[in-house]
A protein has these predicted regions:
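Charge-rich, low-complexity N-terminal segments
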Residues: 2-132
């Protein structure tokens, strides 16, 4: 195998992600009144921000992880230790709506954004890969 062939195999499209945690409270206003999620409760949300693209031959990475963090910090400040229902656009803060909201906030800053994963418990979550 030639050196050029090895480089072509190594420098392909890849997806990377950075993991964040937020603590937040919410209630779901559109479920029946007797549903447990209609009551005020909180979660330790686990949020993954994924970006995908070609691996840069010089740096060896898709994107600097620090750039992902820098883009997410202002979003995290709006969510962490807040009542999500009070955040404009999150009046019905399901995991699905939260993932889409985060996408809309980050996509101008992260053009290679490929997926948002929101996990509200250790067994429940969703992933959003952007508008069709």
């Amino acid at each position: 195998m030639t050196h050029e062939t090895r480089l072509a195999q190594v420098y392909k499209r890849m997806e990377i992600f950075r993991l964040f945690h937020i603590e937040a409270a919410h209630r779901l206003p559109n479920v029946p009144a007797d549903h447990k999620c209609a009551r005020l409760h909180g979660h330790s949300f686990r949020i993954e921000i994924h970006v995908a693209g070609e691996v840069n031959r010089d740096s060896g990475w898709v994107q600097d992880f620090a750039e992902i963090k820098a883009a997410f910090v202002p979003v995290k400040e709006r969510l962490d230790h807040h009542y999500l229902n009070d955040v404009p656009g999150l009046e019905n803060p399901t995991s699905e709506n939260l993932a889409e909201w985060i996408w809309n906030e980050l996509s101008p800053e992260l053009p290679m954004l490929s997926k948002i994963v929101v996990q509200e418990t250790c067994t429940c979550g969703c992933s959003y890969e952007g508008p069709e």
